[in-house]
């Protein structure tokens, strides 16, 4: 008899068929309490859980006593209570490698769009404001040869450093929990403390997961240390930044502009002051959102769950100690 799983994400037919070859699959729209109650027996017997974006917490786990593995279609897992899974010997799988290059493309796009004011001037053209040769009021700033500061030198940080160093001749500074010798050797990146990075960088790019240590790592003090000409990019997690402090820094001219893919609350409120600022490029968490990469993420998550329920957790496992 096949193990049973809960699937709370719509998958392409070929990936669904791959799952069905190994498991009895119950598809649900979400993990809300009313959904769990409606499918109580399926949740109670499920050994696997696959999906994205929904909260996986102790309350849910209490309804899933047979659960052995959860697979998230994402690299981040701040919506999952990992400690609760580990305590129940449930492994958590994620997709850390397949989205690296695509997210780095997004960060580079935010840097370019923000510096060159692409969104702002495109909207002005559409509004019929281009009635004569443009002047300084339409100008942006250069990207090439500017100093890039990367906060979080993981896979995505490395891919961004590669683009910046080789493509735009940008000196690269970085701050991370530990020095990254490959970044220093390949891109001549310079490790420095956060304060030094903030003071010297023309672009400050944040690519950090959300943890207790990184929550509101960027606040009024950090923005005050940045150059008034600096551009701030956040493509990690929204709550790493105190959004009110960012808004104040932009309003007060403490920094030049911001390119944001993530926010403290998502979707971003239509009342957010960020939406009324011409020096802000705000996009709806599109870091990995290409057809190719999202398919590859789903395929990776499917394979991760198949492997995990066969006892294979050599790669992409967040908490391998849970299998001990």
From Swiss-Prot:
This is Glyoxylate/hydroxypyruvate reductase B. It is found in: Cytoplasm. Coiled coil: none annotated. PANTHER family: 2-HYDROXYACID DEHYDROGENASE-RELATED, GLYOXYLATE_HYDROXYPYRUVATE REDUCTASE B. Homodimer. One of its GO terms (molecular function) is hydroxypyruvate reductase (NADPH) activity. Belongs to the D-isomer specific 2-hydroxyacid dehydrogenase family. GhrB subfamily. The active site is at 237, 266, 285 (proton donor). Catalyzes the NADPH-dependent reduction of glyoxylate and hydroxypyruvate into glycolate and glycerate, respectively. It is an enzyme of class 1 (oxidoreductase).
């Amino acid at each position: 008899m096949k193990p049973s799983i809960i699937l709370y994400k719509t998958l392409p037919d070929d990936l669904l068929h791959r799952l069905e070859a190994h498991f009895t699959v119950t598809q649900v729209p979400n993990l809300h309490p009313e959904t769990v109650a409606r499918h109580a027996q399926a949740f109670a017997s499920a050994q696997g859980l696959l999906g994205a974006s929904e909260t996986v917490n102790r309350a849910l786990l209490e309804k899933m006593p047979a659960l052995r593995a959860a697979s998230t279609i994402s690299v981040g897992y701040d919506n999952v209570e990992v400690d609760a899974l580990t305590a129940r010997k449930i492994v958590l799988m994620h997709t850390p490698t397949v989205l690296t290059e695509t997210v780095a493309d997004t960060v580079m796009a935010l840097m370019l769009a923000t510096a060159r004011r692409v969104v702002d001037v495109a909207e002005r053209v559409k509004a019929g404001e281009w009635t004569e040769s443009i002047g300084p009021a339409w100008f942006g700033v250069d990207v090439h040869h500017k100093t890039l500061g990367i906060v979080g030198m993981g896979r995505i940080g490395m891919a961004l450093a590669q683009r910046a160093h080789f493509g735009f001749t940008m000196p690269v500074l970085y701050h991370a929990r530990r020095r990254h010798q490959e970044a220093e050797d390949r891109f001549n990146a310079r490790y420095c403390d956060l304060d030094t990075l903030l003071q010297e960088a023309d672009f400050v790019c944040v690519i950090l997961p959300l943890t207790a240590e990184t929550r509101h790592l960027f606040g009024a003090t950090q923005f005050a240390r940045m150059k008034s000409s600096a551009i701030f990019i956040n493509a990690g997690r929204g709550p790493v930044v105190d959004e009110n402090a960012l808004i104040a820094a932009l309003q007060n001219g403490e920094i030049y502009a911001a390119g944001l893919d993530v926010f403290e609350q998502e979707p971003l409120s239509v009342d957010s002051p960020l939406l009324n600022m011409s020096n802000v490029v705000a996009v709806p968490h599109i870091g990995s959102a290409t057809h190719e990469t999202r398919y590859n993420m789903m395929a990776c998550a499917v394979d991760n769950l198949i492997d995990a329920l066969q006892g294979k957790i050599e790669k992409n496992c967040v908490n391998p100690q849970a299998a001990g």
